[in-house]
Amino acid sequence: KRKLKFMYHQGGIETRYSVIPDYQFEKSNWEFYPATKGLEPFPNLEKRMDWYNKNAGTLAYEAIKNCLAKTKEKNITHLITVSCTGMSAPGLDIELMQLLNLPPSTFRTSINFMGCYAAIHALKIADAFCKTDKHARVMIVCVELCTLHFQKEKTLDNLTSSMLFADGAAAALVIGDETENGLFINHFYSTVVKKRKKDMAWAL
């Protein structure tokens, strides 16, 4: 309890969001969880992925629109989608192409199930695209619906993840034109600490 209280007060998280409406309604109006003792039958993976597919695209699309609203650049040549809380085929990349009316020739890359560092990997790929083609306009969008994967067992990992992670999306446009205003990507470095692999493990 002391560890959890410390993490809660030191986390710096003011607001957490969820695509699950149950948290604001009485049990009689729940849509995701069964209004039964013990929440049984507990939502299975199929239901979680169904909710992911219904909500992830909308969140990602809104994040991209907000990103484009802050720049003169409107042309997207490359699309990188990032997520580890859901996937399907056809995937999020195809859905976003249709929502954004992107040409079918748009270069698409999907980064799935890499976890918290996936956004850095996406930036690395976008940087490589831009160095190869100075006319590249790479849209990165990350979307995670963590609350869909809530587990009711009272383990430290489950409690910690429920405390830290929620639902949301963010987008960034990476371009090769250095004359544009904005942040610059200088270089990347990564390494793997073998003894700590289990610290960020997650299996379906």
Residue positions per predicted region:
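Phosphate/pyrophosphate-binding loops at sites that engage ATP/ADP/AMP, CoA/4′-phosphopantetheine
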Residues: 63-76
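Short beta-strand segments
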Residues: 82, 112, 137-144, 166, ...
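Conserved catalytic cysteine-centered active-site region
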Residues: 34-42, 54, 58, 83-136, ...
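Short glycine-rich or small-residue beta-strand-to-loop segments that form or flank ligand, phosphate
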Residues: 77-83
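Short acidic/polar capping segments at secondary-structure boundaries
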Residues: 85-87, 115-116, 143-147, 153-154, ...
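Structural alpha/beta core scaffold segments of enzyme domains
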Residues: 65, 133, 139-141
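Condensing-enzyme catalytic core mediating Claisen C-C bond formation in acyl metabolism
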Residues: 1-51, 137, 152-204
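Short loop/turn motifs at secondary-structure junctions
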Residues: 72-75, 134, 184
